[in-house]
Amino acid sequence: MIRIQHLLYKISLSVVFGLITSSLFAQLTMGAKGLGMGQATTAIPGYEWALFANPALLNSDNAAIGFYGLRNYGFAELTDMSATGSVPTKLGVAALGFHRYGDNLFSETRIRFGYKNDWQMLHFGVVANYNHISFGADYGSGGALGLDVGIAAELAEDLWIGARSTNVNHPEYGDIDEELAREMAIGFTYGLNELAVFAFDVVKDVRFPVSYRGGLEIAVIEDLKGRVGITTEPLSYSLGFGYGKDRWSFNFAVQKHELLGFSPGIDFMLYF
């Protein structure tokens, strides 16, 4: 009886989300801070999860490791889990990341190697991204290697511009003839005397309409920050907060999809 109920639950889940296919893809942008700011992460300087956003803005100040989890729409089967680590060196910043989405019926795994450097006012980064998808039972699997690039610059004090492009080599899973997601984005951020940060992105996935993303971070009290954001295509709203010290930080956010409901995300960072 329990197995039958579990099977019916799986079937219902597949039917419901099969009706809204554009929402089934794993999150490409990681981190609860970015989630709380509407995923407008293309131009946030020193963003801890820049390896999954714009690699040109990897943190150059400290070595860091972090862990992130997101439960999409409250379903355990649609969970994103990821980890990241970065180390500044004399030759630039090296970074390594891992991301997994899904369950035993369908899963997507990404392993990312990133590098960032700068020349005068220009910051640039590149990521080699191995993607692997697996279908349950004997339905097969596939892998592909993608290449992401990003650039960024500080136009004026606390005013940043960034741009990125994912999978510029047009990779595809050979055995199943499926292309990886390809996305281009440009973004701006402006910091207001350490009291607030405004972020705005324009993102175009080749499969979907243009998405506009905006976010705001406000310093509430010492070491505590509040965040709100909005994303279009699909329409979603988000809010969250972050608290941190010199050696660690903690971030939490909730995203509300216009049709599918709430997705809570949490991350924890350590700095060395």
Please give the residue ranges for each predicted region.
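Bacterial N-terminal signal peptides that target proteins for export
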Residues: 2-15
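Subset of outer-membrane beta-barrel
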Residues: 27-272
